[in-house]
Amino acid sequence: MNGHLCAQGVLPNIRLVNVPSHYKSDTLYNSNDTSIAGRYMLDEMTIIDETNPAYRLMDSVYANRKKHDPDNIGPMRFKTYDKAAAVLAGDEAVKEYITNEIGYKTNLFVMESISEAVVVPPNGKKETVVASKISGVKQPQFNIFLSELSNVSIYQEDIKYIGDTYLSPVNHYVRGNNKKYYFNIEDTIINAPADTTFVLSFRPLLKQDFNGFKGVIKVNSVDWAVESVIADFVKSGASLYDLKINHKFNKHPSGQWLPSEWLTVIGMANGLIAVDTASLTTPADSLQADSAYLFGYPQINVERYFYDYEYDSTLRKRDVGHIKLDMDENAYYKSDTYWNNNRYVPLTEEDENAYKLVDSISKEAHLDKLANLSSVILNGYIPIWIFNMPIEFMAMLDNYEKLRLGIGLETNSRLSKHISLGGFWGWGFRDAKAKWGIYAKALIDKRTDFRAMLGYSKNICKTSSYESIYSRANLFDPETYRYYLGSNWNTVKTEFVDVSIRPFSDFMFRAGFYVSNKKPTYNYQYVVSNSDNILVTRNEFNFTTLNLGVIFAYKEKFVMTSTGLKSRGTKFPILTVDYQRGMKGVLHGEYVYDKIEASLFGRYNVGEKGRFTFEIKGGYIDSDIPYPNLFVPLAGYSPITYFTPRAFGTMRVGEFVSDLYAYIFLQYDFGNIFNRKGLFRPSPSLVFNYGYGNLINNSLEKHIGIDARTMEKGFYEAGFLVNDLFGVSYLSFGLGVMCRFGYYSFPKVLDNLSLKFTVTM
């Protein structure tokens, strides 16, 4: 294409006949370089064949991906050694300066762990940390963090890492018109006859916007397995860090390609460390003439080594179970002799110095206590000596009290690892009344998450709900606002006992016994017949109930922590069933009834951007009971308000009531379909909600003072949202509108509309 022709050896004169159309025909004489006159000039260009051979290679890798997936090998046992070291990256002069100030080379932080793992296809993998060592602190949550950082495989379909999801080039390169990655063969290495290693570069295709990778992958032609991959994470939006991986695989005598050495590098380029160049004793090569500072930044290097592979046909599903990451109780107490004999690779000089430096600082600055403080705060508590102060009791918002300020205290593990005693007190500003409660909690068995709780409270609760001490979700959860949506509130005095247990991997069972007195805060009267068969009204009600429930979450995985099991979720829908039996004549109970509710909730990623969320709910009450325990839909109408998933955004508070209901909530998020970069990345979303409700065993005439009706004709609403319209730092804001239609729509169009705003991170 650049116009140069070369003929080697002794050749006679050559007559060029079939030359490209943009050159003239001519005779070349066997002499020095000769130029061929051009008719016209063309710019140089590169033409790529539509049948790119690199894609044919990736077809074979894709077809064999399950065979070589590290989570799909076995049944097998193996061990891993993990080491994470925080180092200072950036200008060498900065690192030199830090070394001179301290007096020796050192890393900023180091932690290690040794784990024993089992893999039983198709049930997955379980790791047990048998040894752990962390400079300065002894906190189990760091081992969970280390495992999450080092447990990323290029074979995973959707790679979840530090809160984001990335599309693997092995699973998502996709042929045809929907290709996501471009591949190119860079080199071919002949290992032996019929054994070749292909070196391919890859990157996201231009004009594609998704979280992915770019780098180099080596593919073996015999087994079509990945030999190694070196890649940078490519994030579509703003990022707080830079990520790189370097994974190597070795061929086992069995013929299986197994992980050998994995390296993950996390560069926190936004955490700059500046050094005044005037303080440097030696000039820096990278120093610019007009620069007064040099910069470095923290970087975490996470190494994982796999060894002692052993196939074990005796392994069964129960050997994996539902605990993905377990912790040996003696993991933190291994001797130096143990580490010297079992550490897979020796520590560097910088690693050893980091232990000495950080341990000495920890004794002076009490880093272990600070680490414990951060852990507890992330779990919703502030530790004070032998007490924890639950954050949720400090400030609460709802549409009845408007604002409640208070305090809560409960004993922590420093007093007892299994039993906790606590209480709370709060003051509601709108109703000018105090709420309080006392309780005791017990963690009976961590492995089955067997827990018990009993207590007494004087609080408020929404109509149709029964609630114990805890009633608020994490303030940082976008669905927390569901709790604050409008409802008819009741004052409630409750004595209760709750137990829950997870005896099997996919099931959690719970049971509770409640004795409660409810009094509506609104003007409500319930019509009943007295002993003389005369109709009277009441506005205070006593309930004694037995509550049973089960949650089925297929293949839900957990990690073991010091406080019990923590869920890592499941990709399958979650089924929840709750049953309540009202008992008359038992501890002042006045009503006998059966109440059952069930819900099916699921969330699925569609393609590389879309996400579909659904919930189907239903419930039934077989008897005539007061309004506070009937079913009331979650209504969230206001002319302008926050969008709340799985709630009726155009329904008024207390507008409908039922003892038989069925709800459907659907939402589809398209993602950043416009492939915009930066903070303006509009992401449209469609919402559809349906509700049916009726009073089968009750009559509206018996409920005086409520302006409610049934919705047996079907309630319909739909909405259109645009998320990420504009952003501030790492928060994005959006707008949308919900519209009510169908039989229960209002004559005025504006009454059917509700403007919504959204907030995402």
Regions found by a protein language model. Name each.
Residues T165-P169, Y307, Y311-M761:
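Exposed, low-structure sequence patches enriched in small/polar residues
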Residues L243, K251-E261, I266, I300-D312, ...:
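Transmembrane beta-barrel wall of Gram-negative outer-membrane proteins
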Residues K83-A85, L205-K207, V234-S236, V265-G271, ...:
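Hydrophobic lipid-interacting interfaces of membrane-associated proteins
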Residues V17, Y23, A37-G212, T281-M396, ...:
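Structured extracytoplasmic
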Residues L5-G9:
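Boundary at the C-terminal end of the N-terminal hydrophobic targeting segment
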Residues P75, P193-S201, A225-I230, Q256-E261, ...:
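Short, hydrophobic/aromatic-rich segments at coil-to-beta transitions
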Residues V229-S236, Y241-K251, P259-G271, L421, ...:
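Strand-loop-strand
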Residues G215-I217, S221, K244-G255:
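Extended lipid/amphipathic-ligand handling interfaces
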